[in-house]
A protein has these predicted regions:
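Sec-dependent signal peptide recognition
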Residues: 2-11
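Cyclophilin-like peptidyl-prolyl cis-trans isomerases
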Residues: 9, 16-186
Length: 186
């Protein structure tokens, strides 16, 4: 009897652990392939909650990578002006909008801006993150504890590397940009 109970407890623990972990994994579908992302609710709970809500509501679908700087990062997430499938799409204004939800208070943490890091974009105000985020191509330690890290690419970084780069003379602005096909929980 004790052995059966012990095995059931182990099975329950393993099942629960996998379920908890999976709810914080996302799939970012790009034109070249799927990117698997691990979210970090333990260090950025409000940012993770926002990303998951917007993603699972479909708000990021068809949103362009409006600012992409080679050797640095790819920025996306302007759900107001950057959604290429809606009437309000305006590539010239992409990067200036966000969602209708209130801005988030910063959740700066000790996670580094390494290759594959996902971090929230914001204005000069540290409490202005809303929907925009970026993925680092290379380490960017000068951003550490200045921007909220909320996730990391765990598979498919080679597809992020294929995102069309912007004009280095124009702060990475991209003509005819690549877009997020879909973004959702795994």
């Amino acid at each position: 009897m004790n052995k059966v109970l012990f095995k059931l407890l182990i099975l329950f623990f393993l099942t629960t652990t996998n379920t908890i972990g999976d709810e914080n994994k996302m799939i970012l579908k790009l034109k070249d392939g799927d990117v698997k992302i691990q979210l970090f609710p333990d260090v950025a709970p409000n940012h993770v909650e926002r990303i998951k809500k917007l993603a699972n509501d479909g708000a990021y679908n068809n949103v362009v990578f409006h600012r992409v700087i080679d050797g640095f990062m790819a920025q996306t997430g302007d759900v107001k002006f950057g959604n290429s499938s809606v009437e309000s799409f305006d590539l010239r204004r992409a990067g200036m909008g966000g969602s209708d939800l209130p801005d988030l208070k910063q959740e700066f943490n000790n996670l580094p801006h390494d290759r594959g890091t996902l971090s929230m974009a914001r204005s000069q105000d540290p409490n202005s993150a809303n929907s925009q985020f970026f993925i680092c191509f290379e380490p960017a330690p000068f951003l550490d504890r200045q921007y909220t890290v909320f996730g990391k690419v765990i598979e498919g970084m080679e597809f992020v590397d294929k995102i069309k780069r912007g004009d280095s003379n124009n702060n990475g602005s991209v003509d005819d940009p690549d877009k997020i096909i879909s973004f959702k929980s795994e």
